[in-house]
Curated annotation (Swiss-Prot):
Family annotation (NCBIfam families): PRK04239.1
Record-given protein name: DNA-binding protein YN1551_1057
Entries under SUPFAM superfamilies matching the protein: Double-stranded DNA-binding domain
InterPro entries: DNA_bind_arc, PDCD5-like, PDCD5-like_sf
Source organism of the structure: Saccharolobus islandicus (strain Y.N.15.51 / Yellowstone #2)
Family: Belongs to the PDCD5 family.
Taxonomy, superkingdom: Archaea
Gene Ontology, cellular component aspect: cytosol
């Protein structure tokens, strides 16, 4: 009785090894794909931004990576659609950042309602 069990254990171990190898391969392919996309994005940004503007974007990325990612995507989309002149200077990037900041500002109002607690 124990012989079939050990055989099944060996099959199970082999199956687990194969699954782990497949998962590792999938993760490696995904990592390569992301690296390639990031490289393409950096290449596009080198074309559409002046060195000073790229430096400002890099500084933003250090402090607010999610915001910088969104900004990069927006800049690329604007440049590819022809809605913004290329290359974008540091001053133009500052103006874009100010516009985004104004759009994102929200007025918070606190209303205090008096209730009679009995």
């Amino acid at each position: 009785m124990s012989a079939p069990t050990s055989y099944n254990d060996e099959e199970l171990e082999e199956l687990l090894r194969r699954k782990a190898a497949q998962e590792q391969k999938r993760l490696e392919e995904e990592r390569k794909r992301k690296a390639e996309l990031e490289s393409q994005k950096e290449s596009i940004l080198r074309v559409i931004l002046t060195p000073e503007a790229r430096q400002r974007l890099t500084n933003i990325k250090l402090v607010k990576p999610e915001f910088a990612e969104s900004l990069e995507n927006q800049l690329i989309a604007l440049a590819q659609s022809g809605r913004i002149k290329v290359p974008i200077t540091d001053e133009e990037l500052k103006q874009i950042l100010e516009q985004i900041s104004e759009q994102n500002r929200r007025d918070f109002k606190i209303q205090i309602r008096e209730r009679g607690w009995k």
